[in-house]
From Swiss-Prot:
Localization (cell): Membrane
Disruption phenotype: Increases sensitivity to copper.
Main location: membrane
Gene Ontology biological process: copper ion homeostasis
Top-rank lineage group of the source organism: Eukaryota
GO cellular component, one term: membrane
Transmembrane portions of the chain: 35-55, 74-94
The keyword Transmembrane helix belongs to this UniProt entry's keyword annotation: yes
UniProt entry keywords in alphabetical sequence: Membrane, Transmembrane, Transmembrane helix
Membrane topology qualifier: Multi-pass membrane protein
Protein name: Increased copper sensitivity protein 3
Length: 131
């Protein structure tokens, strides 16, 4: 497991393994600059217990509240404990496949087309869809 802090090229905190990486974003899509022990603990626990508590789906199109968020990404199909923290974002991605998915309490994530294809390298800076 590799833990990298914000650098010049990648300004978001992440914990990366062979298959996925987790990043934490504020609600305004700005990266977290001050890495607290809580953030590190949450991300570490998520990395360790990820296969137990979460169900991943390889998807081509992800829709959140009827709005298409991103293509070529992986989305959660279950709730994420981090949504107890208001305005938190979760990044889950295969290598070279990165996306930002806003997760809130009782937020349905609609998944279509269970096909994974190669996508862009950059993390899209998206805003929350209007309610």
């Amino acid at each position: 497991m590799h833990i990298s802090l914000p650098t010049r090229n990648k300004s978001y905190f992440r914990i990366r393994t062979r298959t996925y990486q987790i990043g934490l974003y504020h609600s305004d899509s700005s990266p977290i600059r001050d890495i607290s022990v809580l953030h590190l603990l949450i991300a570490t626990l998520c990395t360790i217990f990820f296969p137990i508590f979460f169900s991943l789906s390889k998807v081509q199109v992800v829709q959140w509240q009827g709005t298409t968020i991103s293509k070529n990404c992986i989305a959660l199909t279950m709730s994420f404990p981090l949504n107890a923290i208001p305005g938190m974002y979760l990044i889950i991605a295969f290598p070279r496949l990165q996306t930002v998915i806003p997760l809130q309490r009782n937020t349905p994530v609609r998944i279509t087309k269970s096909v994974i294809v190669k996508g862009a390298v950059s993390v899209p800076r998206i805003s929350s869809p209007m309610h």
